Structure formats: C-alpha cells, structure tokens
Amino acid sequence: MNEETKQFVGTWELQAWSVVNVGSGKKRHAYGGNAVGHIMYTADGWVSATLMETGRKAVSDDRNTIQALKRSILEHPAGPLDSDQMDLMRQFYLACTGYVAYCGPFDVADGEVHHRVREALMPQMIDTTLTRKYQFVEDRLTLTATTRDMQDQLIWRRHD
C-alpha cells in the first residue's frame, strides 16, 4: 500500500455534509443538517460507509407482517394494498431514504479515491464506482463528488 493510500486507513466520523446545485449555486445540508455517519478504510483495501438522518421514526419489526407485505408486493405488483400495508410501505420508504450504506474495495489515484461498491442498501449502487476528490487537512478528510447537477461535500474527522 502506498503512502497516499495509507492516509485513508482508519475510522472517520462525519462532521458536515453539504450539497450544492451546480446550476443554481444553491447550497443545502443533506438531511436538513441532521446527518451522522462513519466511513472506515481498512489496510487491506476495503471501505465501508454508513450515513443516516437522525430522528428517523422506528418501523415495525414484526417479521410476519413485513414478510406478508413483501409477498403481496411480489405476487401482485400492480395490485392494491390495504391501508395498513400502505402505512407500513410509507414507514419503510422514509426509513430507507434517510440511510446510505455500502462497502467494497477502494483505490486511490491522481487525487481521487474510488469506492468500488460490492454491497449496498440501494441495489442501483451495486457494481458502480463512486469517485471522490479528496483533501486531507490535519485530522480532517474532505470528500467531494459531482453527479449530474449536484456536488456533495462530506467532511470527516479521524476517529480516535
């Protein structure tokens, strides 16, 4: 592992996450500024990231109810759901859209870190590469990514 890559190894705690609309220049904070998270880089070249919106409401943990809803959706994709099922869907939608999680190998080259996603909460992230420009200042790591018309900047502090 080269010196550039070694700088990443360890656990980092999210300090700030801002999102800028590239076209308008309008800046906002992800999850209304209520984001927490950690990113871990291992010496054997893996990254694991979890970020979440604080204050998310708890959802049902009744496995039978959850499995019944899943079966209903899979067996009748266009079929109607009753009001209890719709409420449960709403709860899970809100919980999932307030959470980001992925892991996979990473590599560093030319001022960028590449997260090669193998597993993720959101299936569309699997088998993609998330490229971030990076900067180290003291105990801080800033990762910046531009996708379509948005630029995300995440500031992490090395966790002791």
Model-derived regions, located:
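Lipid interaction determinants
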Residues: 1-160
